């Protein structure tokens, strides 16, 4: 029997999108050295925590109150995200990460918060992408094998997604989303600021 190929009018609809907010910080180059100096000074004067980090340095967690240059910058950035309406209040906490050669972050998410994110301060070439893992179930993972590469690229339909970091940019994403940071294969430090955000509203609290 000869197989007949039909011409069809084809469309698709993506439901329930998982939104990541990508921001470019204006005039970052004017602030870069001060931010990097702040990170190194903090490493010299405070204890190290490890959590998901392997081989690198993580600071303690601090509430964003606007008490220093970095906190003021974070507050101003959060207030400038156009997707957020003016009825919410954001309570945020941050920590710094310095990954030398060979350091990486294992798979994790950010519990007890609504959003998580990262601001990249120093990103040498080959210092490691942030890698997101799909929260979909195993059946959806199997479904991906049926799609063409072109369709997966067009719809961002992947099981894992490598996002290349860039200095002076920020990424904000749902805190439940599993992610990891690849090994730093450069000969220099990779420096970033991670943060958690709790969303408060007069009618509800997401968490």
Positions of the model-derived regions?
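Short beta-strand segments enriched in hydrophobic/aromatic residues
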Residues: 121, 177, 197-199
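Non-heme Fe(II)/2-oxoglutarate
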Residues: 2-86, 104
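Histidine-centered metal-chelating micro-motifs
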Residues: 103-104, 176-180
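Catalytic core of non-heme Fe(II) oxygenases with the double-stranded beta-helix
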Residues: 99-172, 189, 202-206
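Preference for bulky hydrophobic residues occupying beta-strand positions
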Residues: 23, 96, 119, 195-197
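Active-site region of the double-stranded beta-helix
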Residues: 64-94, 100-114, 119-126
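Short conserved micro-motifs at the rims of enzyme active sites and ligand-binding pockets
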Residues: 34, 184, 204-207
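Ligand-binding loop in jelly-roll beta-barrel domains
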Residues: 182-192
């Amino acid at each position: 029997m000869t197989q007949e190929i039909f011409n069809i009018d084809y469309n698709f609809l993506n439901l329930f999108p998982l939104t990541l907010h990508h921001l470019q910080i204006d005039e970052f180059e004017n602030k870069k050295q001060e931010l990097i100096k702040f990170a190194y000074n903090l490493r010299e004067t405070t204890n190290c925590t490890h959590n998901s980090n392997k081989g690198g340095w993580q600071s303690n967690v601090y509430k964003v109150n606007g008490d220093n240059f970095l906190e003021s910058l974070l507050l101003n950035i959060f207030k400038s995200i156009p997707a957020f309406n003016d009825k919410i209040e954001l309570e945020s906490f941050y920590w710094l990460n310095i990954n030398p050669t060979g350091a990486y972050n294992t798979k994790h998410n950010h519990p007890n918060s609504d959003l998580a994110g990262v601001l990249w301060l120093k990103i040498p070439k080959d210092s490691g992408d942030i890698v997101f893992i799909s929260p979909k179930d195993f059946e959806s993972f199997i479904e991906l094998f049926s799609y063409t590469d072109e369709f997966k690229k067009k719809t961002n339909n992947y099981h894992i997604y490598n996002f290349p970091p860039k200095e002076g940019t920020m990424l904000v994403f749902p805190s439940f989303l599993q992610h990891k940071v690849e090994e730093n294969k450069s000969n220099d430090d990779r420096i970033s600021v991670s943060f958690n955000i709790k969303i408060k509203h007069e009618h509800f609290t997401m968490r």
